[in-house]
């Protein structure tokens, strides 16, 4: 079985399956690497409203709202996420870079 921790030092360092490349008061640029363990992409809720723009996406990355079918992520896709709305990512090939706008 693949041990993703050996390949994904960001998870070991931050405890999160991503790296924040840029953080401002208005937005975060976040990268999910190609070697993350898919089990780390869990259902969760955020404490604020957000819009998420896909900057770069490898093949097959998906976003899913609770009780909805997953949506394929492609560059320039924008997703709105309400405060405390359940959602998750599904791992694809390559990396995923998102711009998360705080509302």
How does the language model describe each region?
Residues 82-103:
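Ligand-binding loop in jelly-roll beta-barrel domains
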Residues 26-48, 80-83:
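Conserved short histidine dyad/triad with adjacent acidic residue
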Residues 7-30:
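Transition segment at domain starts
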């Amino acid at each position: 079985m693949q041990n993703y921790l050996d390949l994904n030092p960001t998870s070991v360092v931050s405890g999160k399956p991503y790296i924040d490349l840029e953080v401002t008061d208005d937005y975060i640029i976040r990268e999910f690497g190609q070697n993350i363990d898919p089990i780390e992409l869990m259902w969760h809720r955020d404490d604020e409203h957000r819009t998420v723009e896909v900057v770069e996406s490898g093949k097959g990355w998906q976003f899913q709202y609770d009780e909805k079918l997953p949506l394929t992520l492609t560059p320039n896709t924008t997703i709105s996420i309400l405060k405390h709305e359940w959602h998750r990512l599904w791992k694809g090939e390559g990396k995923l870079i998102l711009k998360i706008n705080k509302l």
